């Protein structure tokens, strides 16, 4: 039961945090990002927010710094929007799974091209 509540709260937080970052946070360091997942602890007191950042390493670093600075403000707005007994502490984490997936796809594509090339030669 607790796990289900944590999962539901995570989905709600994902939606609300995405909206807050898009519409409310005005920090110029925060670039184009996507909230990919939110993991809420079973006691509902902590939330890890995973974000994917579009851009180079410098832009990613600046975006993560901007998010860290805006964490208190984001948490305050979450407290106003989401009716829970305790507003979870928010911790932002960079999610590189999209980049990792793109890299794997690129490698698979390269292997396939090499196999086709070998078949044509042989």
Swiss-Prot record:
Cleaved signal peptide residues: none
InterPro entries cross-referenced by the UniProt entry: KH_dom-like_a/b, RbfA, RbfA_dom_sf, Ribosome-bd_factorA_CS
One Pfam family from the record: RBFA
Sorted UniProt keywords: Cytoplasm, Ribosome biogenesis
Gene3D superfamilies named in the record: 3.30.300.20
GO cellular component: cytosol
One annotated GO molecular function: ribosomal small subunit binding
One GO process term, biological-process aspect: maturation of SSU-rRNA
Major localisation: cytoplasm
Compartment(s): Cytoplasm
Record SUPFAM superfamilies: Ribosome-binding factor A, RbfA (SSF89919)
Keyword Cytoplasm tagged: yes
Record-stated family: Belongs to the RbfA family.
Purpose: One of several proteins that assist in the late maturation steps of the functional core of the 30S ribosomal subunit. Associates with free 30S ribosomal subunits (but not with 30S subunits that are part of 70S ribosomes or polysomes). Required for efficient processing of 16S rRNA. May interact with the 5'-terminal helix region of 16S rRNA.
Subunit structure: Monomer. Binds 30S ribosomal subunits, but not 50S ribosomal subunits or 70S ribosomes.
Protein name, per record: Ribosome-binding factor A
Record organism: Halothermothrix orenii (strain H 168 / OCM 544 / DSM 9562)
Native organism taxonomy: Bacteria, Bacillati, Bacillota, Clostridia, Halanaerobiales
Gene name of the encoded protein: rbfA
């Amino acid at each position: 039961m607790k796990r289900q509540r944590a999962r539901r709260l995570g989905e709600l937080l994902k939606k609300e945090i995405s909206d807050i970052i898009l519409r409310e946070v005005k920090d110029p360091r925060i670039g184009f990002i996507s909230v990919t997942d939110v993991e809420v602890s079973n006691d509902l007191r902590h939330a890890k927010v995973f974000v994917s950042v579009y851009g180079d390493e410098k832009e990613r670093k600046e975006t993560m710094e901007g998010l860290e600075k805006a964490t208190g403000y984001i948490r305050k707005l979450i407290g106003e929007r989401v009716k829970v007994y305790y507003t979870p502490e928010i911790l932002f984490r960079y999610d590189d799974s999209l980049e990792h997936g793109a890299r794997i796809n690129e490698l698979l594509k390269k292997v396939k091209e090499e196999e086709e090339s070998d078949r044509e030669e042989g």
